[in-house]
Amino acid sequence: MRPNRYEDTGNTTGDVSSNTPSTSGRWDLRRLNPPNRLWGSNGVTFGPDGRLYVAQFLAGQISAVDTATGDVDVVVPLDGPVQAPDDLAFGADGSMYIADLTPGRVWRRSPEGAYSLVSDQVQVPNGITCVGDRLFVNEMKMNGRLLELFPDGGDPVVLTDGLALGNAMQLGPDGCLYYPHMIGNQVWRIPPDGGTPELFAEEVDDPVAVRFDRGGVLVVLSRGPAGIVTRIDLATGARSVVVSGVLGLDNAAFDAENRMFVSSFGSGGVTEMREDGRTREIVPRGLSGPFGVTVDLRGTVYAADHYRLASPGDSGEHDSSGVITHELQPFVHGITADDGLLHFASEYGDVRTYDPVHRTTRVRAQGLNEPTGIERSPDGALVVAESGAGRVVRIDGRIDGTDTVTVLAEGLRHPVDIAFDAEGRCYVSDDELGAVLRIDDGGTVTVADGLGAPQGLAVRGDELFTVDVEHRCLRAVSLTTGETRIDAENLAVGLPPGITRTEPALFAAGMPGTPHPFAGLAVAPDGSLLLSANGEGSVLRLSARAPL
């Protein structure tokens, strides 16, 4: 089995390609959850070789899973021409067709492994299916289109438009293409040669994928937290509904024995699901990032995991993935705990405050340019690294419940994370400048430079710690002398060693695209450090050896 950006032995983590464990002479390192072998699992289909092929949008690759053994092999690597695969289908000749969502491309991969571009005229391509030698794709956007594409040349033909976020579709036994409107809770159908689309089913829970089992029954997956699956008899319209508990279902495929295998955009992995909702794990689920990490005063660790708020390991009850999901929270990246509340920053522009007890969310700011790291200042304001604008901003709440946003510093290259020391001084990491800066009276002072690509930032006593993603290490900076040292090496952060790739865009035709990775860092009440090992999908706890 080829490794999938993870190393699956021991209590520490390391570079996948070198199999070198993380090392530190000052800290004991321990994973709070296992590495994610198959994160960002989206479109699934069985290939000519009998394996289940999985499009991994967040990972930027496609893997093949042996459903008998759980073995995973990378087939389309993340440094190839495909950037953000969200769905896939096989043609009659064994060619793989790939919906590359963020750049708006559809690819053909020949049985020999050669790539050719089928179309770049589809916006946010998602659901894709083959009908014999014919190829169809739809758009995951408002007023999206369903099109036929021609791999051997020819302009796309639009069958219909007006889709309210299309997604996984399939030809039914009646000869029509069935597809969901994710916004609107509907399933529609249309003949492959065109015509008037027909509304087939309404009030279907958050439909994200429509599939047909071997008996011709329509199976509709829900993208919600309960993992609802609805079965509909085409002839009678009779329905049955089961709750599987698989959060964030994305797609499904049936094998020759009519066993259903499902993927999860929320937590990855592959799960076999029976008709009554019972499940059997094939590839364990896990964290999709993680991005930012924080810990509250009770010691509960929270990870911002793009689609959800999660806790790893010893933070509470969890499944075999070692992770508990608290809430589906779309597009969370920066995170900080604050007296029973959690504050989120989304790279897509907003800052939110979440009350986990009452499960309420308050929007604090919108329209920011890629806000990433977030921290509460000593006086109660929220301070955010606005990475895309090169700024650090402050969000203050008013008595009337509104908020004001003011600029603390600007002209930075790419600020990523925020931290405060005991005296209330504010620090910011800049991974393009390779430095940590202190904000003084609207300007910045360099605290340490030559740090590679510092991202996650935290202050512990009189030392500042940052995750250097370029060199895959944890760096310590003395706030009294300015001296720096490396405290841990060979961390599984960022891309695997030797891999370079074009970073997909944050937005795609006005829709959320691919998030930018962010390796967060936090200090726990007991003085340990929590680190987002986003190269493998785990959270690390670093406990100081005595004496430090």
Question: Residue ranges of each PLM-predicted region?
Answer:
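Beta-strand-rich domains and repeat architectures in extracellular enzymes and scaffolds
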Residues: 32-61, 533-538
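Beta-rich, blade/repeat-based domains predominating
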Residues: 35-49, 79-96, 105, 121-143, ...
